[in-house]
């Protein structure tokens, strides 16, 4: 798989953007993509030193134009991406990631939770297209590389979801 392969898209009128928006700026599906890609990368690569759930098959099923977390996308790119994805397959991916994460968490020892991960594991995320070299994306490697596995459970695995979830719920209930 290759990393981010975005193309510039023409700006949609504001009312068209809002149709796809999870807030006044970001589509709901992007919020889910972003949080679950991060959960997939952190749980599988950093916490378990295993393989991420996301692969070429998921890329095709979801019909995503990117493999990374989407941090470096401009709003126009996010809107264009959101129009093309298969939402049902994104939901299936989210469920697969969540089930897998629960298995990983159930097997962690206290010693592992207190430990840091090797730099090689962190760099795998870039090598496998989970982040791009854009500064808005690559900073995640520095951030995650400074956390213990316990810190990863608290930050990218828990509070990160809670940061994005209210925006999505507000739009659904709104």
Locate predicted features.
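An N-terminal domain-cap segment
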Residues: 1-22
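Short secondary-structure boundary micro-motifs
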Residues: 2-4, 87-88, 138-140, 146
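Short, contiguous alpha-helical
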Residues: 15-72, 102, 119-174
């Amino acid at each position: 798989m290759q990393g981010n392969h975005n193309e510039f898209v023409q700006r949609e009128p504001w009312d068209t953007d809002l149709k796809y928006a999870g807030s006044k700026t970001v589509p709901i599906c992007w919020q889910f993509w972003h949080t679950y890609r991060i959960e997939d990368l952190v749980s599988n690569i950093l916490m378990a030193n295993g393989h991420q759930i996301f692969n070429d098959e998921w890329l095709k099923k979801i019909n995503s134009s990117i493999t990374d977390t989407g941090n470096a996308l401009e709003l126009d790119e996010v809107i264009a991406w959101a129009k093309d994805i298969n939402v049902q397959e994104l939901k299936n991916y989210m469920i697969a990631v969540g089930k897998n994460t629960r298995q990983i968490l159930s097997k962690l020892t206290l010693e592992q939770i207190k430990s840091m991960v090797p730099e090689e594991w962190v760099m795998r995320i870039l090598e496998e297209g989970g982040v791009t070299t854009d500064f808005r994306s690559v900073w995640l490697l520095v951030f995650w590389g400074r956390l213990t596995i316990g810190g990863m459970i608290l930050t990218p695995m828990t509070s990160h979801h809670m940061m994005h979830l209210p925006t999505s719920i507000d739009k659904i209930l709104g």
